[in-house]
Amino acid sequence: MNDLRVEVAVGDRMLEQWRYVHNVIVPPDELSADEVRERSGRNRLENVYLGDELVGCSTVRPPGAEDGVATVIARVLPEYRGRGIGAALYEHCLAHARGLGARHIQTVVLAANGDGVRFAEARGFVEVERYVAPEDENEVWLTLRLGA
């Protein structure tokens, strides 16, 4: 997959691309442009391209000072899944999180996203928490930790 490219989302155009992918994959947690800009100040947001085509995005939340837990989230648009893009993106994000000094890695997945849950479990993530979003009692989220 030589034409796969991961770029840090900087500037309005790239942040809007990141927001598009996020909102397609996580519609219950749709983000505004302002929310994405705020997140970009505290997390590493990246876009993934296959050639010139936007195919996914990622988030790496830096490890907490006390617990050393970093959060890695890889998102691939449905029409591009099953091609190894998610695996390559995940490995890229994992390396970045470890480079930040993460002692533990976790991910967060909407429980209704069966593809995302299976992807995480296939890579050794284990569910450690299940919670309901405060604004929508039908929105169940999973926190999964690598090698928990």
Question: Where do the PLM segments sit?
Answer:
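Short amphipathic alpha-helix that is part of the acyltransferase structural core
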Residues: 1-33, 140-148
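Short acidic/glycine-enriched loop/turn segments that link adjacent beta-strands
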Residues: 42, 66-68, 113, 135-138
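Conserved beta-strand in the GNAT
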Residues: 47, 53-62, 68-75
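A short, internal acetyl-CoA/4′-phosphopantetheine-binding micro-motif in the GNAT/acyltransferase core
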Residues: 73-81, 109-110
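Conserved GNAT acetyl-CoA-binding A-motif
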Residues: 97-111
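Conserved catalytic-core motifs of GNAT/GCN5-like acyltransferases
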Residues: 106-110, 121-143
